[in-house]
From Swiss-Prot:
Native source species: Bacillus cereus (strain ZK / E33L)
Molecular function GO labels: ATP binding; single-stranded DNA binding
Gene coding for it: recF
Designated name of the protein: DNA replication and repair protein RecF
UniProt keyword Cytoplasm present: yes
Biological process, per Gene Ontology: DNA replication; DNA synthesis involved in DNA repair; double-strand break repair; SOS response
Cleaved signal peptide residues: none
C-alpha cells in the first residue's frame, strides 16, 4: 500500500497544504522546527487517529483555529481509498470514502504505518509505558477488536481508580461497586492479555531471525512478556480470568489503602534478552539499538503477513542516529517494497541506492518545494 497524496488544513504549523508522493521513497528535508516532523506526524495521525508525540489532540490544531483536518488518498492492491480525519475541541471524526465511521476502531487499520523515530531507540531502555504503547499501537493496527477492549478497559480503570480514592476514607459502603468494576476490568483485561501474548509470539518469530542477520549471526533475541499477575501464554481465557480474580482478591485491601489499581495490563512490561542477558540492564548501546531496529523491521514483516500488504514506513530523523552498518541494513531491507518517508536536515553522508530516485520535499516554515531526483 502507499499514500499518493495528502491535504492538510490548520494542522500544526500548516495553514493549508496539498502534496503528492512517490510510491517508493520520499525524502523530507528541512532545518529543525520548520515542519518536517509535523508532516510526518500528519501521515501517522491519518492512519492511527492519534499522534505518537502527544496525547492532547488540541496541540494538533493550528494556533488560534478551532479545527484541523487531514485528508489522504490511499492506494491498496485492489482499491483506492480516501481517508479523512477532522480534529476539533470536541474530539475526532473519521471518514472512509466520504462515509463517517461510527467508531475509530472501524477506521484504524485501513492504512498501516510503522513509525521509527529517535524516541523508538528508547524502546529497550525507556519506561514500561513506552513499551506498552508500542504494543498497543502496533497490535491495534492488525486487530481492531483489541482497540475496543483497550478503550473499555481504560474507561473501567478510570472509574475503579476514582472509586478506590473515594474508599480511602470509608471503604465499607462501596465494596459492592468495587467488585462490579473488578469483574469488568478482568473481563477486558484478560482479552487484552491474550491478544498481547498472540502478538508477541508472532513478533518473536519475525524479530529473532532479523536480529540474527543484523548481528551477523552473533546474537539471539528473545522477547519476554512480564505480566503483573502469574499468568502464562499457555493459559486459556477462563484460566487467565481466574488468576486475575484471585490476584485482585489478594490485593484488595492494599488497593483501597493506596487508592489505585495495582494489577492489570496497564502495569505489565516487556523485556528483551540477547544471548540470555537482559539488554535493558546489561546491553551496550549498540545492542539496544539493534534490538529496536529488529523490532521495527519485524513489525513491517508481521503486518505484511497479516494484511498481505506492506505498511508505510516513516523514518523521522532516525537515520542520523544509526551507524552506517545499521543504516544500510535498514535501507537494504525495505528497498523497492515499502513506501518510505525519510526526514532529515541533510542527505549528506547518507549514501544509498534507495535514496537516489527519491522525491525530495524541502520544508521551510510550513511551506514546501518538491523535486524528483534522477541522478
Amino acid at each position: 500500500m502507499f499514500i499518493s497524496e495528502i491535504q492538510l488544513k490548520n494542522y500544526r504549523n500548516y495553514e493549508k497544504l496539498e502534496l503528492s508522493f512517490e510510491d517508493k521513497v520520499n525524502v523530507i528535508i528541512g532545518e529543525n522546527a520548520q515542519g518536517k516532523t509535523n508532516l510526518m506526524e500528519a501521515i501517522y495521525v491519518l492512519a492511527m487517529a492519534k499522534s505518537h508525540r502527544t496525547s492532547n489532540d488540541r496541540e494538533l490544531i493550528r494556533w488560534d483555529e478551532d479545527f484541523g483536518q487531514i485528508k489522504g488518498k490511499l492506494q491498496k492492491r485492489n482499491s483506492s481509498l480516501s481517508l479523512e480525519l477532522n480534529i476539533s475541541k470536541k474530539g475526532k471524526k473519521a471518514k472512509l470514502n466520504q462515509l463517517e465511521q461510527q467508531k475509530l476502531s472501524q477506521y484504524i487499520g485501513v492504512m498501516n504505518v510503522v513509525m521509527f523515530a529517535p524516541e523508538d531507540l528508547n524502546l529497550v531502555k525507556g519506561s514500561p509505558q513506552v513499551r506498552r504503547r508500542f504494543l498497543d499501537m502496533e497490535l491495534g493496527q492488525i486487530a481492531p477488536v483489541y482497540l475496543y477492549e483497550l478503550s473499555q478497559y481504560q474507561k473501567v480503570l478510570t472509574q475503579r481508580n476514582h472509586l478506590l480514592k473515594k474508599m480511602q476514607g470509608n471503604s465499607k459502603n462501596e465494596e459492592t461497586m468495587l467488585d462490579v468494576f473488578t469483574l469488568q476490568l478482568i473481563e477486558h483485561g484478560a482479552k487484552i492479555l491474550q491478544k498481547r501474548f498472540e502478538f508477541l509470539h508472532l513478533l518473536q518469530e519475525w524479530a529473532a531471525p532479523i536480529h540474527r542477520g543484523i548481528s551477523r549471526g552473533l546474537e539471539e533475541l528473545e522477547i519476554v512478556y512480564k505480566p503483573s499477575v502469574d499468568v502464562s501464554e499457555s493459559m486459556d481465557l477462563s484460566k487467565i480470568k481466574e488468576v486475575y480474580y484471585e490476584s485482585f482478591q489478594s490485593v484488595k485491601q492494599r488497593e483501597i489503602f493506596r487508592g489505585t489499581t495495582l494489577l492489570g495490563p496497564h502495569r505489565d512490561d516487556l523485556q528483551f534478552f540477547v544471548n540470555s542477558k537482559n539488554v535493558q540492564v546489561f546491553g551496550s548501546q549498540g545492542q539496544q539499538r539493534t534490538t529496536a531496529l529488529s523490532l521495527k523491521l519485524a513489525e513491517i514483516e508481521l503486518i505484511y503477513s497479516e494484511v498481505k500488504e506492506y505498511p508505510i514506513l516513516l523514518l523521522d530523523d532516525v537515520l542520523s542516529e544509526l551507524d552506517d552498518y545499521r543504516q544500510s541494513h535498514l535501507l537494504n531491507t525495505i528497498q523497492g517494497k515499502v513506501q518510505t518517508f525519510v526526514t532529515t536536515t541533510s542527505v549528506d553522508g547518507i549514501e544509498h541506492e534507495t535514496l537516489k530516485e527519491a522525491k525530495t520535499i524541502h520544508v521551510t516554515n510550513g511551506t514546501v518545494d518538491c523535486e524528483i531526483d534522477r541522478e
